[in-house]
């Protein structure tokens, strides 16, 4: 049974989702073997997940810290549960013998110098997705923009194609350049709409106020995005810990890992919070120990 698929930290949310008759979780009964297999690769046996995105180049170009993706990943990928990237980086920078699950970014065709980041299209076919043998796909969802209908329609069509082949879709709540949108009311709306359209996992931003409402209003697992790099490492551990306590199953953090002074120490600290229930201070202590070569 896929008992850990919808495991969350929030007890109330867990009780609401749990199906006592089947000893599993609501939604599992309609999943085929392929879908279950892919999801169990992404979400670990403790019901938690640490995804490492290195897909930023699809709209930012050679981002600081990702000038050479293969070099960036070499030291840190082992600490992630899955890696999120584009097909170009996958083909050219990743060893085909890698056993780490891959989440393929399939939306794009916009850049930071263009008119509107919300005007994304799906840039990969289902044939390509299967050819690359990935564990899941991801695409951005822009609600509240002039491209809202296009964005949500693209998500629905992608879900239709991927469900036919047992490939889970992760919807990525996107705000573009409008960072002020990162409040609970907006995030809860996008998360719920994405789940209603068939996304199996939702990636959204953390917000200090009412984040539990974002999670409780979403019937599929929620992972937290990192957003712009924080000023201190403690801030990262603080929001990851708080978000996990409020029901998120994990994180999808990139810049707050590979743009830090010590990416290995950063991802090990984050992993300790996600999988080992470390407090922010315990994670910071581990970060400093790794940084000093003592752990």
Segments and roles (model prediction):
Residues 54, 87, 141, 206, ...:
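Short secondary-structure boundary segments
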Residues 259-291:
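C-terminal helical cap(s) of enzyme catalytic domains, especially alpha/beta-barrels
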Residues 24-99, 104:
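Conserved N-terminal beta1-alpha1 strand-loop-helix module at the mouth
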Residues 101-106, 221-226:
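Short hydrophobic/aromatic-enriched beta-strand-loop microsegments
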Residues 249-258:
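Short acidic/histidine-rich active-site segments
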Residues 51, 57-83, 107-109, 118-220, ...:
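Alpha/beta enzyme core
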